[in-house]
Amino acid sequence: MAMMELIDIIRAKSNDQRNYLLKDHLKETVARIDDFHNFYQTNREKFSYKIGEKTFRALAMASIIHDLGKIDYNFQKKLMGDDSEAWEVLEEFLSPLKPLKRSPRHEILSIIWSTFLLGNDDLDAMMRTAILLHHYNEYFLNDKDLMEIIFTYRDAFEIYLNFIIEKKETLRIFIEDILNYIQNSLESDLVISAADEIRSNMDFEKPELLLEKIKEYDDDISEFAAFYEPEERSADILILSGILRRADYSASAGVDIELFSEEVFRDIDEKITSKIGGAPWQIRLMGELGGPKKMVLVAPTGSGKTEFSILWAAKHGRKFIYTLPLRVALNDIFMRLRDSDGYFSEDEIDILHSTAFIEYLKEERLGRGTDLDSMMTSARLMASPALLTTPDQVLITSLNYFGSDKVISVYPFASMILDEIQTYNEEMAAVIIKTLELVNEVDGNILVMTATLPPYFRSFLDAMNFEVMDVAAIPGAHDIKNLNLKRHVPQLIEEPLFNDELEVSDKLGKILDENSEKNVLIVVNNVQKAIELYREYQDDPDVYLLHSRLLEKVKSQRIGEVKKRSQDERGLTVISTQIIEASVDIDFDLMITEISTIDSQIQRWGRIHRNRDADYDSGDPNIIIFTDSDRRTSLIYDKKVLDATRAILERYDGQILDYNLERSMIEEVFQEEIDGSTLKEIYENQIRETISDLDYFTVEKRTQAQRLFRNMAGYKVFIPDAVLRYSESEIERTFAELIKGDYRLWKDILGEIERITGEKTTMWDLKKVLYEYSVNVPVFYEEKSDFWSRTTGEFKGFYVWGSMEDDDVELLEELGLDSIFGETESSLIV
């Protein structure tokens, strides 16, 4: 067999994918390393983690070697089938591997190639480890040791080594052909030096020596080819393996590994000045501060913190990664920043969260020609110059999940913005702080933004040398929106809004009658309360129910309708859980709320008198708080904090409050002493204990880490019967029927839809249907409901409830999940 035939036959993936030949995938992966090397050279001064030429050469070598384990009988047969002419040729060559009934994963077989193509110093050990873990396998959690790997796969390794020994002359020429093909295609000094070093290292006598050691149970096998496994978490291996993974994945997807250019921030001062008008405080403050690398910005809700974050990122000339906890709010910011009069062009900014593709579909519907696959892939690989994302995508790397290195490798060239830090409870705060410590370790840039900095965060941020800037201290700060505006007059009602039997206080109806010409927001502490309260008013078209366990489509429609109507109409009432706090930019006239912790209270108040130019000068209260706790509230909030909150609220009952007074209330609550310690100290100790536990914590996959992090850990459940009841689209209805009928492959589903309807659709359009007609089911429903008896299957990460009664579908659409199950006690409130 001619050697060119071999290099032109061996595949890396099926032939319906781009660059399916192994030589082309390796070339494209090396090209990404070369591109990243050039990007690094251009932006060297902006990187806080320095990468030398020797390290880049090692990365290029690893990218050539990483998939050589795909030279395997079983792998190639699976890709090619039995009847192709190419397979007939290749089958003969790979026949020594035929006795392998089940081959090890290709990245494990690639380790054999690394034993005679790489050296054995510390850098080689890092690259060998990165090769082993460029896909998930058991060695992510287990010891990475050559002896352990060999004796786990002893028979397979002996067969594979014998294959290499038998075919060594052919394989020597094959490797030389691969090296020539790659370096001639790319014509790069880095690639040439990497290829030359592989040639220098290449020693086909080593497989014979290794096989001999295996047969003799030699004690020094582990030293034959070292792995990198430091006693403590190492930023070095995480960054380098992350770069290799990004190169591999972006090569497979056909997207660039890095898209940043300083042009992304061109004329940003002028754009912000034009949009805001006058002399924006953000530009003044940036001029005075010089943009410290680690900073906390404390500024009122609605004052323009997002604009400041863009200026801060521009000052440092790094990619802009902005995180916000709630998807709905993030979607709004994405559309605002990417709009025709926004700050970024369409190809400069991406969005990444579990339903982000829906935002791209909206863009496509507007005729903007978005390439969904490329946009989503580049966002996932952190290639975008500007990225909006939820924290569970980029700020949970301290949970040590597989693939976290891909995110960590971006930290040294990113300006990370963490907005709404006050929304995290102590456990989530610990994860965030631990991750910030990791970003700090690689000297990354971090901007924390908040309207109300929780006092218990301060000591952890101080330890990382964050500079705290309170806009109230800026000279001439009087023009900052909502800073000095007197916005809120609280009134306390010393009884619970609900009793333990979920009966509503008689005073609520009277308050609503007296304020019938106002837009009223009622915030309660759990979903069941919201549903029970809404039942009393559900015939009124001006009353809306909002919470997290509605169908996604219904929730989005209601939020959009409330936003639109509230601009011109009065007399609307929204009954909500605190999902409203950070997700919906709506200005209400009056809030009625249950007692909660002081920081949560003031967060809620931010929806009242939000977008006004003048002080609130009515003598009537616009914040009404039912201050007693019922049993359900006690399940959610710490009694110590509620008692302290209640005491502080009593001091300010009936007073008109501005932003500064409200912040001082938070400080007062957390200075309250309980058993010799302040609340602030109690929270700090709880966070420290959790951080300490994280030192020994690892989860296997990112989805597991996200589930641990999210305030509401749960399952997404698709409801096909809701599609059949409410959708008028024949394509959507056919899709629902197919899922009910147990179709599970996109290829089959798309083909069947076209056959039945005569119309073509895309996977992305059907994914949109999945999300819109899904509901979030908390994990505690698993044990306290008939969750599993309703579940008829799974599809693409969703559980499927394939047989629901019409009455249940109606209840789900109008009231949400809890109306079907009834009340299930939990501390979850959204």
Curated annotation (Swiss-Prot):
Q: Which UniProt keywords apply?
A: Antiviral defense, ATP-binding, Helicase, Hydrolase, Magnesium, Metal-binding, Nuclease, Nucleotide-binding
Any one Gene Ontology BP term: defense response to virus
State the top-level EC class.
Answer: hydrolase
Flavoprotein is among the record's keywords: no
Residues bound to Mg(2+) are D67, H135
Which cofactors? Mg(2+); Mn(2+)
In the record, the effect of D347A is given as: Loss of R-loop unwinding
Q: Where is the HD Cas3-type domain?
A: 15-250
Q: Name one Pfam family in it.
A: Cas3-like_C_2
Looking up InterPro entries in the UniProt record yields: Cas3-like_dom, CRISPR-assoc_Cas3_HD, CRISPR-assoc_Cas3_HD_sf, DEAD/DEAH_box_helicase_dom, Helicase_ATP-bd, Helicase_Cas3_CRISPR-ass_core, P-loop_NTPase
UniProt lists the family membership as follows: In the N-terminal section; belongs to the CRISPR-associated nuclease Cas3-HD family.
- Supply the name of the protein: CRISPR-associated nuclease/helicase Cas3
What organism is the protein native to? Methanothermobacter thermautotrophicus (strain ATCC 29096 / DSM 1053 / JCM 10044 / NBRC 100330 / Delta H)
